[in-house]
Amino acid sequence: MSCWRDEIFGPVAAIAAFDTEAEAVSAANDSDRGLAGFFYSRDYAQIWRVARELECGMVGVNDVGVSTPETPFGGYKTSGIGKEGSSMGLDEYSNVKLIDFGGL
């Protein structure tokens, strides 16, 4: 299914059932893109485990509202480099320089 691998940017819900958690995570990560991922669960251990394993910049758990002005917006892989929004977004417009002086 192309909607699994392409960012379609439309009002589409790509829903599928999986036999195992590992199968679901593998299918979600089988793409060269990784802007956002979404899943539903009531199991806190599973929520943290799956959220860490998903190769995407934003994860929505039981919610689709992952983009607000105070949260970092950005993806992994070919879905963008860097973050917009939040204090992390300011880092994209900054140049950090270390100047180390030895004994003068």
Language model segments and positions:
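Conserved C-terminal structural/oligomerization subdomain of aldehyde/semialdehyde dehydrogenase
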Residues: 1-104
